[in-house]
C-alpha cells in the first residue's frame, strides 16, 4: 500500500467529531470497569473495539482519536459499535483476558437481542486492546 493510500485511510479521524456520542452502558460483571458502551448505528454491522493502555491504564472513553474513529464508524459507516472496558492495573493478568472474553459473550447476547448481523462482526483494538482482540479469536469458546 503506498503512502497516499495510508494517509487517505486516516482522513476520517480528522473529520469526525471527538465528542462522545450517546451510548447505552451494558454491565457484564461486578467491577465498574466491566462495562461495555453501545453506540447504535443504522445497519446491522458490528464493530467491537477494545482500548489499549499497556494493560495498566486507559479506558474505553479516554482516547480522543479513538472517539473520532468510533464516531466515524457510527455516523458515516453506520456500524453498531461496542466499546469494551476491562480491569487494568497491577493485577490485570489474567483478568483483562477473562474480562474481554466475558464481554464478548455478553455482546453476542446483545447482538441477538438487537437482531444485528452475526456475519458482519469486526473485533479490533489498539495496542493491548489488539492483543486482547486476538485472545478472543484464540479463545476455546470461539474456535
Feature map (PLM): residue ranges:
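N-terminal cap/lid segment of alpha/beta-hydrolase-fold proteins
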Residues: 14-42
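Loop/turn elements at helix/coil->beta-strand transitions in domains of secreted/extracellular proteins
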Residues: 43-45, 77-79, 118-120
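Serine-hydrolase catalytic-loop signature spanning alpha/beta hydrolases and amidase-signature enzymes
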Residues: 54-57, 61-62, 81, 106
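Short beta-to-alpha linker loops that shape the active-site pocket of alpha/beta-hydrolase fold enzymes
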Residues: 53, 85-89
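Short amphipathic alpha-helix adjacent to the substrate-entry channel of hydrolases
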Residues: 61-82
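Short beta-strand element of the alpha/beta-hydrolase
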Residues: 44-54
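Sec-dependent signal peptide recognition
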Residues: 2-10
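Primarily recognizes the serine-hydrolase "nucleophile elbow" in alpha/beta-hydrolase
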Residues: 102-143
Amino acid at each position: 500500500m503506498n503512502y497516499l493510500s495510508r494517509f487517505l485511510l486516516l482522513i476520517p479521524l480528522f473529520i469526525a467529531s471527538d465528542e462522545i456520542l450517546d451510548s447505552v452502558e451494558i454491565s457484564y460483571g461486578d467491577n465498574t470497569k466491566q462495562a461495555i458502551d453501545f453506540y447504535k448505528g443504522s445497519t446491522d454491522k458490528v464493530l467491537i473495539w477494545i482500548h489499549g493502555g499497556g494493560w495498566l491504564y486507559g479506558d474505553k472513553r479516554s482516547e480522543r482519536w479513538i472517539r473520532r474513529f468510533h464516531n466515524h464508524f457510527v455516523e458515516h459507516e453506520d456500524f453498531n459499535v461496542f466499546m469494551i472496558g476491562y480491569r487494568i492495573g497491577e493485577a490485570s493478568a489474567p483478568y483483562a483476558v477473562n474480562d474481554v472474553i466475558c464481554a464478548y459473550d455478553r455482546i453476542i447476547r446483545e447482538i441477538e437481542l438487537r437482531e444485528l448481523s452475526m456475519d458482519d462482526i469486526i473485533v479490533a483494538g489498539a495496542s493491548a486492546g489488539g492483543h486482547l482482540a486476538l485472545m478472543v479469536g484464540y479463545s476455546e469458546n470461539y474456535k
